[in-house]
A protein has these predicted regions:
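Active-site microenvironment for binding and transforming phosphate-containing groups
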Residues: 1-169
Length: 169
């Protein structure tokens, strides 16, 4: 649907979009969630995925890799993924439902990415994303984490948690 414009209602709901069309920008709106940009220079295919904790637990990142490889011919060995600014583990305090969802996806392999703090948990969504992408066949050197926390840098990025959900100007 290239050319629809940014503010047109979409005919679908999705946490990821991919393309093999040259010079076609892919856009999305994000707050604290892990936006991940994909590009394969070998096939000139691209994608963008929105990975909130539910999407991460549903496997949106490896599913995006799978669609790019199977439908667009992207090569896992040349595919690059960049995890953009998002809320970091230190600022992402959750109840038990989030780590439980991640454990259902990854089993015990998720434990290094979860810190228990009393009755709350701090979850490293970026670390989980990097692990899922390398498990999906991407080279570790082609998976880049921006390292930027949207909540800590709320003067530069909009953060749902930093603003307590308040939107607008």
């Amino acid at each position: 649907e290239a050319g629809m414009g940014l503010h047109q209602p979409m005919a679908w709901e999705s946490d990821a979009i991919v393309t093999a069309l040259p010079e076609t920008p892919l856009c999305g709106f994000y707050a604290d969630c892990v936006v991940t940009l994909f590009y394969d220079p070998a096939t000139q295919t691209a994608g963008v995925a929105h990975a909130g904790w539910r999407g991460m637990a549903a496997g949106i990142l490896p599913k995006t890799v799978e669609v790019m490889a199977e439908k667009l011919g992207a090569k896992r060995e040349s595919l690059i993924a960049v995890l953009g600014p998002s809320i970091r583990q230190e600022c992402f305090e959750t109840d038990a439902d989030v780590p439980e969802a991640m454990e259902r996806l990854m089993g015990e392999r998720v434990h290094p990415f979860i810190a228990e703090k009393g009755v709350k948990f701090h979850v490293d969504l970026q670390g989980i994303g990097v692990r899922l992408l390398t498990d999906a066949g991407l080279s570790p050197e082609n998976v880049i984490d921006s390292g930027i926390c949207t909540k800590c840098c709320a003067d530069e990025f909009w953060s749902h948690r930093a603003t307590h959900g308040h939107r607008g100007v």
